[in-house]
Amino acid sequence: WDKDIMLIRLNKPVSYSEHIAPLSLPSSPPIVGSVCRPHCANINLLDYEVCRTAHPQFRLPATSRILCAGVLEGGIDTCHR
């Protein structure tokens, strides 16, 4: 869970800071479908504690580095379209 990478489209530009910076991607990424499967979905960003409370079975670590996103009712998240 911790330190995964995802792409999000922002509604407005951001200023770079200690916590916001460009990320260099590998020049030779893996073949799509071999180890990665891209998904696209319109989802909501949720408060991290909301995710921890809603899904105790996942035993999410107590860290603020995780971006909580999806639909609380289920069915759409990083693994499902």
Swiss-Prot record:
Pfam family, one: Trypsin
Protein location: Secreted
Keywords: Disulfide bond, Fibrinogenolytic toxin, Hemostasis impairing toxin, Hydrolase, Protease, Secreted, Serine protease, Toxin
EC number(s) stated in the UniProt entry for this protein: 3.4.21.-
Active site feature: 4
Disulfide bonds: 51-68
Coiled coil: none
Lineage: superkingdom: Eukaryota
Expression (tissue specificity): Expressed by the vanom gland.
Quaternary state and interactors: Monomer.
Homology family: Belongs to the peptidase S1 family.
Protein's UniProt name: Thrombin-like enzyme collinein-3
Organism for this UniProt entry: Crotalus durissus collilineatus
